[in-house]
UniProtKB/Swiss-Prot annotation:
GO cellular component terms, A-Z: cytoplasm; nucleus
Principal subcellular localization: cytoplasm
GO molecular function, one term: ribonucleoside-diphosphate reductase inhibitor activity
Cell compartment(s), UniProt: Cytoplasm; Nucleus
Protein function: Regulates the ribonucleotide reductase activity.
Lineage of origin: Eukaryota, Fungi, Dikarya, Ascomycota, Taphrinomycotina
InterPro entries: RNR_inhibitor
Record protein name field: S-phase delaying protein 2
Organism encoding this protein: Schizosaccharomyces pombe (strain 972 / ATCC 24843) (Fission yeast)
Amino acid sequence: MSETFKLPDHDELPQLVQTTLFDVGARVRKAVQTGYKFDQQLFPSYHKDQTDRNELPQQKHDPNLRLDDLKQELAADSIFWDTASTQEIADSFAKPDFLKSH
């Protein structure tokens, strides 16, 4: 028999849960930043302001997208992984000192 415990909406989460959620959020943000740096190294021409706008495949479908918008809003979506780097980044992401390393 399973029971579900529901916290009242106005109550704060326990400290342990708050800490865990904060840690997960921080790690996700750091992983996106790391992936974005990796993306810039792999595709440097995508991140230059003088890039031909037709070079970006997303912009062929929507000419209103500007390169600056893509840099900011689609940073997470523009991460292109290769298989060797995926494991390396996953390993570094799992290390306890990951947040201090970059």
